[in-house]
Amino acid sequence: MRYVAAYMLATLGGNEKPSESDLKKILDSVGIEVEKDQLTKVINELKGKNLDEVIAEGEKKLASVPSGGGVAAAAPAAGGGGADPAEAKEEKKEEPEEESDDDMGFGLFD
C-alpha cells in the first residue's frame, strides 16, 4: 500500500510516469524502507493506467467483499434460547459492586 500511495503522490504532483528513484525519494522522506521487488511490481502494474480508473476498480472490488456486519446480526439467532428469562434476571442481580477510589490509595484530584 505504501508504494501505491507514493505512486499516487508522485502522479498528483505532476509526475505522470514516476520512476523507482522518484518513489524511493518519497518513501525515504518519511522514513519508510523500500523493498525493491515490491516497488518494481507496483510500478509495472500501474504503468500506463489512469489512476481514477484504478481507484474506481478498487472500489468495486471492495464493495464485493463481505464486511462482517451480517455475521454479527446472525449470531444471536443461532444461539438458541435455552435459558429462561427469569434466570437471566436473577443473574443480573448478582453482579459485583463497583470498586471505589478509596481502595486505590489515591484520589483523582490529589
UniProtKB/Swiss-Prot annotation:
It comes from Cryptochiton stelleri (Giant gumboot chiton). The keyword Metal-binding does not apply. Belongs to the eukaryotic ribosomal protein P1/P2 family. Residues 86-95 have a biased composition (Basic and acidic residues). GO terms for molecular function: structural constituent of ribosome. Phosphorylated. Residues 63-110 are annotated as: Disordered. One of its GO terms (cellular component) is cytosolic large ribosomal subunit. P1 and P2 exist as dimers at the large ribosomal subunit. The keyword Ribosomal protein applies. GO terms for biological process: cytoplasmic translational elongation. This is Large ribosomal subunit protein P2. Keywords: Phosphoprotein, Ribonucleoprotein, Ribosomal protein. It comes from the Eukaryota. Plays an important role in the elongation step of protein synthesis.
